């Protein structure tokens, strides 16, 4: 056991948590992409025509799917308005995307937490919750990277997931809570 893992229950590894968190974030994005990229491409056609008319680069579908993935964590996307203000939107909450997208991150995180607890061999609720919550190590890193990767800029205008809410909800709250729940289930149902 490494020095950084010494405070963790026996068998729980931050390295495994990082790997599981990374895999879970990427898988969640890919599920969202495969499911919604065609619809998003169609929805962006009108916006992209206007943007290109004024000499800007079109919004790539992969970035807009990223916004939708953050929306599935209840993280709104901020975009500028005429007159210098900004507005936040959640495409799922606004009815522009399937509500079922809200279950993608929690389900994947519960499964990851479950797998982490089982692989660590822990058998009690607290150790399982800690093992499952260790998914935060990788998930947080990719949640922060996603905030940068899914930022779209045209001229002086920028659209992006809300930074602080993205870190707090998508990066910390979701993996700790849902990974912890999965880990607790994995530990307490082990035979």
Where are these regions (language model features)?
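Generic detector of intrinsically disordered, low-complexity, polar/charged segments
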Residues: 18, 63, 80-82, 129, ...
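Long, glycine/tryptophan/cysteine-rich extracytoplasmic
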Residues: 25-99, 151-167
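Alpha-helical transmembrane segments of multi-pass integral membrane proteins
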Residues: 114-191
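Hydrophobic alpha-helical transmembrane segments
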Residues: 92-116
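Alpha-helical transmembrane segments of polytopic membrane proteins
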Residues: 17-18, 96-105, 163-176
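Haloarchaeal acidic low-complexity proteome signature biased toward cell-envelope/secretome components but also
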Residues: 1-27, 124-129, 187-191
